């Protein structure tokens, strides 16, 4: 049974200072923000009180520190996340794996609202993998983050053992093994692509530095916030201590949409579509690859004989899917994006089925396709299920596909020049061109 200890000097105060908090080892951590207690006053205490909440003899509560006459603990929490659990002491949890730390930025947003519960349920990392969620938000979203934590608490997920929330990436990213970076500024009316690249680039430069400083040395990073390819490049360039191949830009939603469109055209269920690749940037220059994709094990071009549709209508249908969804529903694709994040992570922690592959935006150094190095480019990958991947070598690239890939490559090179001041590669120069290639529904 949990036991709370109050260590109090002789001098007393009529109430527990509102900046004091119970310390939870499976915890909710409010970084840079101090929340009023949800509990009534306990005992009289003083600014020098030490408060702990524990179910293990060896757990140690942080000492409360005095600042301008107020007590502030370095870590904070509430509710069930305050309890310290010895997972090896219970028969049910003894066989569980070691707890892993997962950071999510933009944690108060709609995508995260769908994603966090999938992570906590065990759907992503498995039914024997306990997790700690580290939720990064802003000062403006801190109350919403508390609401998210309350919903996670009420959901009674056995595998969810810790929840921290905060606004400082240097604290939130401490010791994380996975970082899912969703938070980014949306594109406002009249905002140029170059402005968006710079504004969001600064966010991801800061987060890259924080990951470099605080995260696990082998942390896996999935960048979702747009423009995700170049944001991932900025992030990895600011994290030199982390292997560049550990950074990913999310293009799995594009892959899922492409599979859906091919299945619809062929009149089959979408699980019959395999070997789907999205090449290049997460933009209208992306290249859904029908040349190497298969339906029921057969080349797509043998199943779908309308080759004009493949070359024109297919790509357009993938690119415009997000915009069409907004027209129909009045909101962007948060739920399907969350599902694609789950798919992207599971593709790295689950062995790839024999003969198949998946798409993810990764660093191009050493690629076998002749794509310019120093970019984050979506390419076909396989994984052994250990969190790492290898590029697929046995793919066909004809002249048509090569020309399309080159167009996306040129766009990413232009974006890279535009953020050179954020990657440490010189003075920025923007020559993005007059055509707006941001995907509909993601501006």
Swiss-Prot record:
One Gene Ontology term of the molecular function aspect: L-malate dehydrogenase (NADP+) activity
Pfam families linked to this entry: Ldh_1_C, Ldh_1_N
Disruption phenotype: No visible phenotype under normal growth conditions and high-light conditions in short days.
Cystine connections: 77-82, 418-430
Induction notes from the record: By low temperature and high light.
Main location group: plastid
Keywords, in A-Z order: Chloroplast, Disulfide bond, Isopeptide bond, NADP, Oxidoreductase, Plastid, Transit peptide, Ubl conjugation
Binding, substrate: 187, 193, 226, 257
InterPro entries linked: Lactate/malate_DH_C, Lactate/malate_DH_N, Lactate_DH/Glyco_Ohase_4_C, Malate_DH_AS, Malate_DH_NADP-dep_pln, Malate_DH_type2, NAD(P)-bd_dom_sf
Swiss-Prot/TrEMBL GO biological process terms: malate metabolic process; response to redox state
Catalytic activity: (S)-malate + NADP(+) = oxaloacetate + NADPH + H(+)
Name the record gives this protein: Malate dehydrogenase [NADP], chloroplastic
């Amino acid at each position: 049974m949990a036991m709370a200890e109050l260590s109090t000097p002789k001098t007393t105060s009529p109430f527990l200072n509102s900046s004091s908090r119970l310390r939870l080892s499976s915890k909710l951590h409010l970084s840079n923000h101090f929340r009023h207690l949800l509990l009534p006053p306990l005992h009289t205490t003083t600014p020098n009180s030490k408060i702990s909440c524990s179910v293990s003899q060896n757990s140690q509560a942080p000492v409360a520190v005095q600042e301008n006459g107020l007590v502030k603990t370095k870590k904070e929490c509430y509710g069930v996340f305050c309890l310290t659990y010895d997972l090896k002491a219970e028969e049910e949890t003894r066989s569980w794996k070691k707890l892993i730390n997962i950071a999510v930025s933009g944690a108060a947003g709609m995508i995260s609202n769908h994603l966090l519960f999938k992570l906590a349920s065990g759907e992503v990392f498995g039914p024997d993998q306990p997790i700690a969620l580290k939720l990064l938000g802003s000062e403006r979203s801190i109350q919403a983050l508390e609401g998210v934590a309350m919903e996670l608490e009420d959901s009674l997920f056995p595998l969810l053992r810790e929840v921290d929330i905060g606004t400082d990436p240097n604290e939130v990213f401490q010791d994380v093994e996975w970082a899912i970076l969703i938070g980014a500024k949306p594109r406002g009316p009249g905002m140029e692509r170059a402005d968006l690249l710079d504004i969001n680039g600064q966010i991801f430069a800061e987060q890259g530095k924080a990951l470099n400083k605080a995260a696990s040395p082998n942390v896996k990073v999935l960048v979702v916030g747009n423009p995700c390819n170049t944001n991932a490049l900025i992030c990895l360039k600011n994290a030199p201590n982390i292997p560049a191949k550990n950074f990913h830009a999310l293009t799995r939603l594009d892959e899922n949409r492409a599979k859906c469109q091919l299945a619809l055209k062929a009149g089959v269920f979408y699980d019959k579509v395999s070997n789907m690749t999205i090449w290049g940037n997460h933009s209208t220059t992306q290249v859904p690859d029908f040349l190497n994709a298969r339906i029921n094990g057969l080349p797509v071009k043998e199943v779908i004989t309308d080759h004009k549709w493949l070359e024109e209508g297919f790509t357009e249908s993938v690119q415009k899917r997000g915009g069409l969804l907004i027209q129909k529903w009045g909101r962007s694709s948060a739920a399907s994006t969350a599902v694609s994040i789950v798919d992207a992570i599971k593709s790295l922690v689950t062995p790839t089925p024999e003969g198949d592959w998946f798409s993810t935006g990764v660093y191009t150094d050493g690629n076998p396709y002749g794509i310019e190095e120093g970019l984050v480019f979506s390419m076909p990958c396989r994984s052994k299920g250990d969190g790492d991947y290898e590029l697929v070598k046995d793919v066909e690239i004809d002249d048509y596909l090569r020309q399309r890939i080159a167009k996306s490559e040129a766009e990413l090179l232009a974006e890279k020049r535009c953020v050179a001041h954020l990657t440490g590669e010189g003075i920025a120069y923007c020559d993005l061109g007059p055509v707006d290639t941001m995907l509909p529904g993601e501006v």
